From Swiss-Prot:
This is Eukaryotic translation initiation factor 3 subunit F. It comes from Homo sapiens. Belongs to the eIF-3 subunit F family. Residues 9-36 have a biased composition (Pro residues). One of its GO terms (molecular function) is identical protein binding. Pfam families: JAB (PF01398), MitMem_reg (PF13012). Component of the eukaryotic translation initiation factor 3 (eIF-3) complex, which is composed of 13 subunits: EIF3A, EIF3B, EIF3C, EIF3D, EIF3E, EIF3F, EIF3G, EIF3H, EIF3I, EIF3J, EIF3K, EIF3L and EIF3M. The eIF-3 complex appears to include 3 stable modules: module A is composed of EIF3A, EIF3B, EIF3G and EIF3I; module B is composed of EIF3F, EIF3H, and EIF3M; and module C is composed of EIF3C, EIF3D, EIF3E, EIF3K and EIF3L. EIF3C of module C binds EIF3B of module A and EIF3H of module B, thereby linking the three modules. EIF3J is a labile subunit that binds to the eIF-3 complex via EIF3B. GO terms for biological process: formation of cytoplasmic translation initiation complex; IRES-dependent viral translational initiation; proteolysis; translational initiation. The lineage of its organism: Eukaryota, Metazoa, Chordata, Craniata, Vertebrata. Its EC number is 3.4.19.12. CDD domains: MPN_eIF3f (cd08064). InterPro entries: eIF3f, EIF3F/CSN6-like_C, JAMM/MPN+_dom, MPN. It comes from the Eukaryota. The gene is EIF3F. One of its GO terms (cellular component) is eukaryotic translation initiation factor 3 complex.
């Protein structure tokens, strides 16, 4: 059975005093008020200078003007939304799996598709929004309309809730280096599920020689009684990762120094050796710092001193003979486990040959 899509059409641009992208409207048989209102500029008279100032984008902000669209009833993305307004000072923390998923969906996009879009999932606290997961959403774009498969997005979110019930809908992402008039229309749909949703852009075309990653929130702006516009305000983007994600990131970073951009998985012994080498380098740095402080080359820092003292106190005090006995015992256990594993493997191989006779 075909999955229903929600078509959205964008008519020709209507001039507005806001320097932004071409306005776009959403045709609907039954207009309805927006479910999640977005903070707008305070009302002011047309003769008030503050009203004219409200129509000018502030430095560092990306304006995109669009006529306030009439709401079209569409399948809603279920789940809790961002609590309250999204302050401009809040930080967006991205996990590596987000970037990997976006790039993978872009590489697997349909033939002729200019970009891909998807839903962002994560958690919210007082000072930051942490994006921990995402999934792509099928859509079709042309010069005058965009159709988004919201039923697919609803089903995918229901599946994600079964695995991670704490993840909320935070916004959406799109590949590309700019915000188009279609982005304003798609943003309206996500505004119904998350007040002031995040719009994440990932420049997969590498226009500036790197993959630019930016996050925005939208704000209504304009002169009362005139066509309202939408201004996308940039947010601070930082990167976060769990310990398990850090292992994958370190492995991917090693491909930067490989001529063919390919690197194999290291063995357990190589991982232990690499970790030991990093610990040795860290200890050398600490010893050099201590020597510089004692010689007067560097002024002493009480915070660093307390941290080093706490680190030294955490090291267990073991008699050298006891440590050697423990190490030899662990090595013997490891050798025994290895021997039993090889013996079991040989027995299984022998059994397979006897069965096939």
């Amino acid at each position: 059975m075909a999955t229903p899509a929600v078509p959205v059409s964008a008519p020709p641009a209507t001039p507005t005093p806001v320097p932004a992208a071409a306005p776009a409207s959403v045709p609907a048989p039954t207009p309805a008020p927006a479910a999640a209102p977005v903070p707008a500029a305070a009302p002011a008279s047309s003769s008030d200078p503050a009203a004219a100032a409200a129509a000018t984008a502030a430095p560092g902000q990306t304006p995109a003007s669009a006529q306030a669209p009439a709401q079209t009833p569409a399948p809603a993305l279920p789940g809790p939304a961002l609590p309250g307004p999204f302050p401009g000072g809040r930080v967006v923390r991205l996990h590596p799996v987000i970037l990997a998923s976006i790039v993978d969906s872009y590489e697997r996009r349909n033939e002729g598709a200019a970009r891909v879009i998807g839903t962002l999932l994560g958690t919210v606290d007082k000072h930051s929004v942490e994006v921990t997961n995402c999934f792509s959403v099928p859509h079709n774009e042309s010069e005058d309309e965009v159709a988004v498969d919201m039923e697919f997005a609803k089903n995918m979110y229901e599946l994600h809730k079964k695995v991670s019930p704490n993840e909320l809908i935070l916004g959406w992402y799109a590949t590309g280096h700019d915000i188009t008039e279609h982005s304003v229309l798609i943003h309206e749909y996500y505004s119904r599920e998350a007040p002031n949703p995040i719009h994440l852009t990932v420049d997969t075309s590498l226009q500036n020689g790197r993959m630019s990653i930016k996050a925005y929130v939208s704000t209504l702006m304009g002169v009362p009684g005139r066509t309202m516009g939408v201004m996308f305000t940039p947010l601070t983007v930082k990167y976060a990762y769990y310990d398990t994600e850090r292992i994958g990131v370190d492995l991917i970073m090693k491909t930067c120094f490989s001529p063919n951009r390919v690197i194999g998985l290291s063995s357990d012994l190589q991982q232990v050796g690499g970790a030991s080498a990093r610990i040795q380098d860290a200890l050398s740095t600490v010893l050099q710092y201590a020597e510089d402080v004692l010689s007067g080359k560097v002024s002493a820092d009480n915070t660093v001193g307390r941290f080093l003292m706490s680190l030294v106190n955490q090291v267990p005090k073991i008699v050298p003979d006891d440590f050697e006995t423990m190490l030899n015992s662990n090595i013997n256990d490891l050798l025994m486990v290895t021997y039993l594993a090889n013996l079991t493997q040989s027995q299984i191989a022998l059994n397979e040959k006897l069965v096939n006779l």
